[in-house]
């Protein structure tokens, strides 16, 4: 039996490509419904992290409860769940969408549909959400709302004839959006008498309350004092507080089927309350969990080391604190001959890695060195044993390897048709396999490629943007593994292997990559008192060499005229000294060297 109250609840999220105005629209909705006054408003209210505001991106999911009074005096409860728009956080998006019945699709009237818009839109359609298209930025002179409406109808196949035309910046027609949500988004179905089922769509650590779980109650009710069980981990807790977000926390007595809110239950670690897990009652558990849960799988690995070795403990503490709030971050200790003690960290993708590094440097004031990112390679040894390699230094000897496999991703790139040539060339250079291309309209194309993940994690995105003057957009997802001919490229300085610079590269690229790195390091490594050979090697075979010349003191300065044999003696003596120095000398490697390894010249 659906209660009257339930019929007046709407759960929705906002999906959009980066920079199409998602967080600004959320701000306007909060303002229009009087949830926050103008005075409390602040740009991007739901993006609470400094980093989110600075980069203008949303990283964590957030939620807010809006009370909307229609003209017929009925009050509606609208639960807005803000989702991240970036491809690294795809799983977070899918969990937030699973907590909703509808989604507002924001499309920029000047840019039209982009890759991420499509990807998130298909995610929403998979969850059977009602999609409400909204066209934003119509106050700009270059807006073309009618064309964009046609695009939405042609590509996604949803009716956009009565899509509200709004400007989130100036607050134009915001009321139409609220009306559309009430009209089009279905109310939540779910019985209050059934056993409890609630979906965790985000969790966050609070120093006083422990872990705060953001939940959407699908069936049943939950109140303080209920003993709950988490279905993925099997752990049991007692609920200490339930409430809703007005974006701040507001305590209420309980949550019923269809509600979105938070619960706390003295949970100590975010890992115990994983995003996507199902909460049920310990006494009367649900028979099966809500579908779609999967643990977050790191795709990209990188070593993080403190610049000052003594700060190892502080770095560990920083990572543990970040992990409390970010279940997708994984790390384990490792040592490197060149860099000392540090951690091998796993991330969802490059943006995630970048954000974690920046947060370590910012929030914990630590100077860190990061090594080149790498992916998980599956190595099958000659004795049929299979191992996963995330760090090139752990790769077995060449003679022990039967074959290696690397992860492949499916990429869809949306670009203006003028840039198809350069972009196809870029994908070809990155060992991409062309699948197909479709014209969205006469001027825009979707290109589908399968590309090895390790070709994307360096600087594919930058290269894509520069080839298309910033117009192309990219979306990718992991497809599986494929067998490839790969070798380990080592860098030797002064005859010593620098383990932190090792990398796994495709065999046919080893020579050019080695050549590039040797030349790059020659520019970066400062000249020493002795000459330093830089060698790139595969196995025991050196494939490229550069030499950093020695600095020399003018030992003949005080000889004037003088006898040639005297000069010879001094020069020989200098040569001897340099030789001895080279045997005992060690070379300082500047931080840029580790970073420059990543930038491959196209």
From Swiss-Prot:
Family annotation (CDD domains): EF4_II, EF4_III, LepA, lepA_C
One BP term from GO: positive regulation of translation
UniProt key word Ligase: no
InterPro entries membership: EF-4 (IPR006297), EFG_III/V (IPR035647), EFG_V-like (IPR000640), EFTu-like_2 (IPR004161), G_TR_CS (IPR031157), LepA_C_sf (IPR038363), LepA_CTD (IPR013842), LepA_IV (IPR035654)
Residue ranges occupied by any tr-type G domain in the UniProt entry: 7-189
Binding positions (GTP): 19-24, 136-139
The enzyme's E.C. designation: 3.6.5.n1
GO molecular function: GTP binding; GTPase activity; ribosome binding; translation elongation factor activity
Any matching Pfam family: GTP_EFTU
Source organism superkingdom: Bacteria
UniProt subcellular location: Cell membrane
PROSITE patterns in the record: G_TR_1, G_TR_2
Keyword annotations of the record: Cell membrane, GTP-binding, Hydrolase, Membrane, Nucleotide-binding, Protein biosynthesis
Membrane topology: Peripheral membrane protein
Known catalytic reactions: GTP + H2O = GDP + phosphate + H(+)
GO cellular component: plasma membrane
Keyword Protein biosynthesis (UniProt): yes
PANTHER family in the record: TRANSLATION FACTOR GUF1 HOMOLOG, CHLOROPLASTIC, TRANSLATION FACTOR GUF1-RELATED
NCBIfam families, sorted: lepA, small_GTP
Functional description taken from the UniProt entry: Required for accurate and efficient protein synthesis under certain stress conditions. May act as a fidelity factor of the translation reaction, by catalyzing a one-codon backward translocation of tRNAs on improperly translocated ribosomes. Back-translocation proceeds from a post-translocation (POST) complex to a pre-translocation (PRE) complex, thus giving elongation factor G a second chance to translocate the tRNAs correctly. Binds to ribosomes in a GTP-dependent manner.
Family in the record: Belongs to the TRAFAC class translation factor GTPase superfamily. Classic translation factor GTPase family. LepA subfamily.
Name of the protein in its database record: Elongation factor 4
Record organism: Clostridium tetani (strain Massachusetts / E88)
Lineage of the species this protein comes from: Bacteria, Bacillati, Bacillota, Clostridia, Eubacteriales
Gene: lepA
